[in-house]
């Protein structure tokens, strides 16, 4: 876990965790399922416990997990997917692995295919034929909605696993009578209607950069605290809707827990201020990570795919 706000401390108790200054590190070396308790503590007022959650951490042997399997994987998302930075690293992680994957989709190039569309929110995929200069490959003109069966008929692409990572752009827009979770549920129902055996991962949209330096770069004049709250409400809704659905082949992909929001976002070097030439690093994009951040997304995708039971 990275980038805790300054007023709280996230700590844990268990047999495999290492408490560092800026994060908790899970450092198990032996395959198994480990019990762990996460605690959020207020550092300013007598250290009260604000929240606590018991979790199970499953660790698999990378050398043998899903050995011999070959699966087609589709990433469906917004600009985080469309920029095509984490997909090459996913392929790299599976190079020489006992499990092989093939990334599929109508966008991207070479082996780094996907279904990412910059600027898109969940309702764009469900209800829009095109948006932001990009066509919706899943849009059925007859029903005017997302239709996975139509997509397969048109594209001939049939994945074994679909990982949906959407919600960030929903923060900036209001949807008439729907929420991000409602729209993702619509997409999931359509996919499962085509083939209930397709595994679906719902990736929690990544949090914004810890620094407020870039809050004026996008959505100027919007309070960064308000944006941060909205960005956190979306994964909360996703968790409420899709948790504990593993028996239905629906899984949460906790990408959000593996992003270093303090150190792995894009920065520039500039003067401290107009009268001080001391050089400082400032975040220039609060939404899109730097390459190390995308590589952390790839790490999460790799771990999810290696842990899947087919």
Identify the meaning behind each predicted range:
Residues 56-90:
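An acidic-aromatic substrate-binding cleft motif
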Residues 74, 82-178:
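Conserved SGNH/GDSL esterase-like catalytic core that processes O-acyl groups on lipids
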Residues 208-258, 287, 291-298:
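Substrate-gating cap/lid alpha-helix
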Residues 111-146, 213-222, 244, 253, ...:
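Surface-exposed intrinsically disordered loops and tails
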Residues 1-66:
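Beta-strand-enriched, solvent-exposed domains that form extended recognition/catalytic surfaces
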């Amino acid at each position: 876990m990275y980038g805790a706000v300054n007023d709280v401390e996230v700590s844990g108790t268990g047999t495999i965790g290492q408490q560092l200054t800026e994060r908790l590190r899970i450092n198990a070396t032996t395959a198994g399922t480990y019990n762990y308790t996460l605690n959020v503590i207020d550092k300013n007022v007598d250290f009260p416990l604000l929240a606590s959650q018991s979790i199970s951490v499953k660790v698999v042997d990378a050398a043998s997990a899903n050995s011999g399997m070959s699966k087609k994987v589709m990433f469906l998302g917004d600009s985080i997917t469309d920029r095509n930075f984490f997909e090459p690293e996913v392929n790299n992680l599976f190079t020489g692995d006992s499990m092989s994957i093939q990334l599929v989709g109508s966008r991207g190039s070479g082996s780094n295919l996907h279904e990412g569309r910059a600027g898109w929110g969940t309702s764009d995929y469900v209800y829009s034929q095109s948006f932001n200069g990009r066509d919706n490959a899943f849009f059925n003109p007859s029903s005017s909605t997302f239709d996975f069966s139509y997509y397969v008929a048109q594209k001939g692409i049939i994945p074994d696993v679909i990982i949906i990572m959407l919600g960030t752009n929903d923060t900036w827009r209001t949807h008439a009578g729907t929420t991000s979770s409602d729209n993702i549920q619509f997409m999931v129902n359509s996919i499962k209607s085509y083939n209930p055996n397709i595994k679906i991962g719902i990736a929690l949209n990544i949090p914004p950069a810890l620094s407020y330096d870039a809050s004026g770069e996008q959505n100027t004049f919007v309070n960064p605290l308000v944006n941060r709250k909205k960005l956190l409400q979306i994964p909360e809704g996703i968790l409420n809707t899709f948790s504990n659905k593993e028996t239905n082949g629906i899984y949460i992909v906790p990408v959000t827990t593996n992003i270093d929001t303090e150190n792995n976002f894009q920065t520039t070097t500039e003067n401290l201020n107009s009268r001080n030439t001391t050089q400082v690093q400032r975040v220039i994009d609060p939404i899109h990570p730097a390459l190390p951040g995308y590589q952390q997304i790839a790490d999460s995708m790799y771990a999810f795919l290696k842990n899947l039971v087919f």
